[in-house]
Amino acid sequence: MADLTLCAFLTKVLCAHGGRMFLQDLRGHVELSEAKLRAVLRRAGPERFLLQEVELRDGPWDAEAEVAAGEGAGAGSGGGATACRVMAVSSARLCARYQRGECQGCDQLHLCRRHMLGKCPHRDCWSTCSLSHDIHTPINVQVLKSRGLFGLNEGQLRILLLQNDPCLFPEVCQMYNKGVDVLYGYCSLKDRCNKFHVCKSFVRGECPFQPCKRSHQLIHAATLKLLEDQELSVSSVVNFQIISVYRHKKLHKMLEEKDHSASTEQPQGLGKQGALGAVEARPFLPARAQSPRKPQ
């Protein structure tokens, strides 16, 4: 089985099991050794499969502990057994302009956002909705094929998007993201606010700050209550948090390397030019003409 076909199948299996599985469990669906399966996943890269060594925990499932393990806080820190966890990652996104009726065709999915959240008022009579509920339209088929996702059914695609696409994340409080107050920003509702008090740039995968004064924690007591009230999937938000933390670390590392490269290139350039070169690099500025003095 070619890697592309195999990766499509592995994504399908992962999304059929909530978007993440332990490597050993995933191996039960393919006739490959653990070493060969791990090699396939690594070749595909973290833009397709995120692999993490996490500590195995006893007892009931705990969302906050799951996030902590995904961030590396639990991997081996307690001295217990560890296992490799695999998460399905994708660049597939819903087209935001299509939601507003402004796009006829692009490289993103043209699907009703509310339908993918299971909240479209027209879900029982989808033909009355102005937005598509069909993942198999020509545009959507082309997008899915280009990303190796064509074999997914609607439920599996929903799982994949919920843990990757910021468009499907619950509404973030815009007022919280303004102002100098670290705890509430400009949000006057404070603890009574029914929107997420998290960094909107982090959710979008664009936050350049490390550390950031806004919260990057999507899973805690207050947000768990919001998720429960809005009947949203805690498991999908846990996955979204783990993938977002990875993306934030990757972005921060890239920015650090860019800053380091810029700081080292400038002295090297001046060193090669020497003093004369440094002078020649300056723009030529004509001397200011002096006005003649009046006779005494």
Swiss-Prot record:
The record, for Gene3D superfamilies, names:
Winged helix-like DNA-binding domain superfamily/Winged helix DNA-binding domain (1.10.10.10)
Gene Ontology MF term list: zinc ion binding
Q: Which organism is it from?
A: Mus musculus
The protein, known as: Zinc finger CCCH-type antiviral protein 1-like
Record has Manganese as a keyword = no
PANTHER family hit by this protein: ZINC FINGER CCCH-TYPE ANTIVIRAL PROTEIN 1-LIKE
What domain of life does the UniProt record list for this protein's source? Eukaryota
Q: Which residues carry this modification: N-acetylalanine?
A: 2
Q: Where are the zinc fingers (C3H1-type)?
A: 111-136, 198-219
Query: Which InterPro entries does this UniProt record tie to the protein?
Result: WH-like_DNA-bd_sf (IPR036388), ZAP_HTH (IPR041360), Zc3hav1-like (IPR026693), Znf_CCCH (IPR000571)
